[in-house]
């Protein structure tokens, strides 16, 4: 029965090679480039180094745990496991209570006046008292037999053997990092001793200054905080969460500031474009339709009662009044000046009433305005000046147009000419009457004056006598009376002016 087995196995195994022969050959794997191969090799080396470091750390942790157990015993190892649980913050309430207890113990040790050996003795005494109380309670409750059985069968049972070396693992990892740091520092010392000396001196100086300003108690408390808080941040990834939130806020802030700046730039450019377009449209519109501001017009029309204002027409249809001047009106004294100048310039062609009379008086021979007329006019001007000043200071007066000015000037010129003529005639008549009254009745001189002059000025009584002697008619007397009336009317008119 043993002989047919090989053929059966051979028969059963025959189809397999046939299937393998019938199956198509698998394609060869793609060949990687040299750079990729080198990168893969480096990654494999790094992974192997990490695995080796992990194994070394685990081995060192095991050795440290064994050494601590051998030196301090199981109670110390149990305390180490409890401390590991507290520092890992697996149970937040217990970790918080341990943190508060550690702070209280630290500040008690820092502020108490007792020395270190006093504190150690107190701690040992407290431990002994606790153990005695525990024994008494257990002996009374369970009895001596139970206590003996418990003491005889006492064994250390660890339900979680994997968590025991955790604190020792951290200690071992820290020790390995410290040993690596020492090796690197020794290598740095061999390569550059000067830099190493400078670095060590700088570090020592820094810690000296820090210790002079910050007490050692504060530094120790900071170490305690780091021992409790660093595992909390590391286990819960609090630092990574805070960093991600801060990064998102910074990104939003950066984006918001950039968008705000770009928006302000766009608004400013649009405002500049609108302003330039508006300025161009306003210039075109102002060229077609000039605007007259009320404030500018009021300022131009603001005048005072000092001098004559100068009115000038501008290109846009407005007029300008020089500030501090008074425009000419019908009540202004300056309107008489050009009329008097024109009258005195053209009065030289007016025929003389004396007609060659031999008088050398400048007032009588001058054909200008008489002194009496000037005196009366000065009196009238002195009376009218306050009223004119009050009128000019009372409000603003606008200049007259060309037609009104022409009519006003013509009327004033006519009135002035009429008044001047009447005053001249009256003065001449009064002068003739005074000369006749003062002159002596000498016939020879009269005949001489009659021969030398064209006419003779006689007194009124003499005129009446001559008229009666010559036998004038009543019509001539009526004409003489009309002349008297006209002269009286002219004198009254002159007195009114």
UniProtKB/Swiss-Prot annotation:
Keywords: Autophagy, Endoplasmic reticulum, Golgi apparatus, Membrane, Neurodegeneration, Neuropathy, Phosphoprotein, Transmembrane, Transmembrane helix
Effect of residue 153 to D: Phosphomimetic mutant which enhances self-association. Enhanced membrane scission activity
Residue ranges of the region described as Reticulon homology domain: 84-233
Biased composition (Basic and acidic residues): 334-348, 377-388
Transmembrane intervals: 60-80, 96-116, 119-139, 209-229
Annotated GO MF terms: endoplasmic reticulum-autophagosome adaptor activity
Polar residues biased stretches: 319-330, 471-490
Membrane topology note: Multi-pass membrane protein
Domain notes: The LIR motif interacts with ATG8 family proteins and is necessary to target the ER fragments to autophagosomes for subsequent lysosomal degradation.
Subunit structure, as described in the record: Homooligomer; oligomerization is enhanced following endoplasmic reticulum stress and is mediated by the reticulon homology domain. Interacts with ATG8 family modifier proteins MAP1LC3A, MAP1LC3B, MAP1LC3C, GABARAP, GABARAPL1 and GABARAPL2. Shows higher affinity for GABARAPL1 than for MAP1LC3A or MAP1LC3B.
Protein name as catalogued: Reticulophagy regulator 1
Gene source species: Homo sapiens
Lineage: Eukaryota, Metazoa, Chordata, Craniata, Vertebrata
């Amino acid at each position: 029965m043993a002989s047919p087995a090989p053929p059966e196995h051979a028969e059963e195994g025959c189809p397999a090679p046939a299937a393998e022969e019938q199956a198509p050959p698998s394609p060869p794997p793609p060949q990687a480039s040299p750079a990729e191969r080198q990168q893969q090799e480096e990654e494999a080396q790094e992974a192997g180094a990490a695995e080796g470091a992990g194994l070394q750390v685990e081995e060192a942790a095991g050795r440290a745990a064994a050494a601590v157990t051998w030196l301090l015993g199981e109670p110390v190892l149990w305390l180490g496991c409890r401390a590991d649980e507290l520092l890992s913050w697996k149970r937040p309430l217990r970790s918080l209570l341990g943190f508060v207890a550690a702070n209280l113990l630290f500040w008690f040790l820092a502020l108490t006046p007792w020395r270190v050996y006093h504190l150690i003795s107190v701690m040992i005494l407290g431990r002994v008292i606790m153990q005695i109380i525990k024994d008494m309670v257990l002996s009374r409750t369970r009895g001596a037999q139970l206590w003996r059985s418990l003491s005889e069968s006492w064994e250390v049972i660890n339900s979680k053997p994997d968590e025991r070396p955790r604190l020792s693992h951290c200690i071992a990892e820290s020790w390995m990092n410290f040993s690596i740091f020492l090796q690197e520092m020794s290598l740095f010392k061999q390569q550059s001793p000067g830099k190493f000396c400078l670095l060590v001196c700088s570090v020592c100086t820094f810690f000296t200054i820090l210790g002079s300003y910050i007490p050692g108690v504060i530094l120790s408390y900071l170490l305690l905080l780091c021992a409790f808080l660093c595992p909390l941040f590391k286990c819960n990834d609090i630092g990574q969460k805070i960093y991600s939130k801060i990064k998102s806020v910074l990104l939003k802030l950066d984006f918001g500031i950039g968008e705000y700046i770009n928006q302000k730039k766009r608004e400013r450019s649009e405002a500049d474009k609108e302003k330039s377009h508006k300025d161009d449209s306003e210039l075109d519109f102002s060229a077609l339709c000039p605007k007259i501001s009320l404030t500018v017009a009021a300022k131009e029309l603001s005048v005072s009662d000092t001098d004559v204002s100068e009115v000038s027409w501008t290109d846009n249809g407005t007029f300008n009044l020089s500030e501090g001047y008074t425009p000419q009106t019908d009540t202004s004294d300056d309107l008489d000046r050009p009329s008097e100048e024109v009258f005195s310039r053209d009065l030289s062609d007016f025929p003389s009433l004396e007609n060659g009379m031999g008088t050398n008086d400048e007032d009588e021979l001058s054909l200008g305005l008489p002194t009496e007329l000037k005196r009366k006019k000065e009196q009238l001007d002195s009376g009218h000046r306050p009223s004119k000043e009050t009128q000019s200071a009372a409000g603003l007066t606008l200049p007259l147009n060309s037609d009104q000015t022409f009519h006003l000037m013509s009327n004033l010129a006519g009135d002035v000419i009429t008044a001047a003529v009447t005053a001249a005639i009256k003065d001449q008549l009064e002068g003739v009457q005074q000369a006749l009254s003062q002159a002596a009745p000498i016939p020879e001189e009269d005949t001489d004056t009659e021969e030398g002059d064209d006419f003779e000025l006689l007194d009124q009584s003499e005129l009446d006598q001559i008229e009666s002697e010559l036998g004038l008619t009543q019509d001539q007397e009526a004409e003489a009376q009309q002349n008297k009336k006209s002269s009286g009317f002219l004198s009254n008119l002159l007195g009114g002016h």
